[in-house]
Amino acid sequence: VKSVSIAGVAKSFGGLSVLSGVDLEVPSGSFTAILGSSGSGKTTLLRIIAGFERPDAGVVRLGQRLVDDAEHQFVPCERRRIGYVPQEGALFPHLSVGRNVAFGLARQDRRGTRVGELLELVGLAGLARRYPHQLSGGQQQRVALARALAPDPEIVLLDEPFSSLDASLRASVRADVHGVLRLAGATSILVTHDQDEALSMADQVAILRGGVIAQINTPSSLYSLPRDAELAQFLGEANLVEGTVSGKTVQTALGDLAMAAGPAPSAGPVRVMVRPEQLILGDAATPGVSSVVRSYEYFGHDAVVRVLPENGGLPELVVRITGGAPLVPGTRVGVSVHGAVMVWPTGDREPRPGAWESERERITHA
């Protein structure tokens, strides 16, 4: 199984820069998600790894093998031992499931047991004679995965393979696919615009912003320790409040809060991130910031409560809770903070309305 190494990769279309000096290391046998908005360049990066596109600059290595240096060395896609799962699955409608899976195999392999083994691996044993139109969307994606795994690739690339599935199917299918890839032992790279998908599936997540890797880390570290406020809001709901650093704590209208590990200003004004699940609600007599419930949304596994602090120094806060009776708008509650918070210097990459969506307009080819 091969690692993937990308160094200084750049790509432009018609004079418009799509990727600019991208560096990425994907360890052997790991699962990496490249997360970004539509038009951020993530699919272009995946196509360069696959060999469908050539970079304008930079190098791509699969293991120790140089497969593209943007000038002289180039190994075509069919010689890279890569499996590719496109967005729509792209099954051949006139071929049965078994023949779709066997499409990339040498003739002698077609007569063997490989197809049956793969269909069993993806949970579709016994469906070899069916046709794509007889399958659900989730089953079609699993056939596409089986086809990608058929030649025993060392690397599997997935280009937003779950985006066309119904929300009710998406979580279960991605869990199935993740399990299959783990069993196969292949190095896997997923590109997606779905934060939940990236955080739940990957060993490491690389966030692509404006054609460069803005941050790469484990899912939990990215979510808890984003590099700036803009990334914090891209990765999930975030309450951003003003504060002042004093020693090892930050003074805010929510109280004096412990700061998370990592680089932080030693003094002065900062932006403070409090995730919704860090906020705790109590009754009006509970110590904390006195607030009024504005709305309550129930989602089954949890609920989202929006509260407006009464002291005037705080914006509306988003709180995520589990259990308890529904909260009626107008109810007075006390709000407190649990755990350490992330801080950044004021003005350091502030969130911009529509910042991530604007990437879609900036780039139309990626």
What positions do the PLM features span?
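The feature captures the beta-strand-to-loop junction immediately N-terminal to the Walker
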Residues: 35-37
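Helix-to-loop junction immediately C-terminal to a conserved catalytic motif
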Residues: 50
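Conserved coupling/switch loops of ABC nucleotide-binding domains, chiefly the family-specific signature
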Residues: 56-59, 210
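Conserved ABC transporter NBD signature motif
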Residues: 58-70
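ABC ATPase nucleotide-binding domains
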Residues: 81-83, 87, 91, 96-230
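Non-catalytic connector elements of ABC transporters
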Residues: 238, 248-366
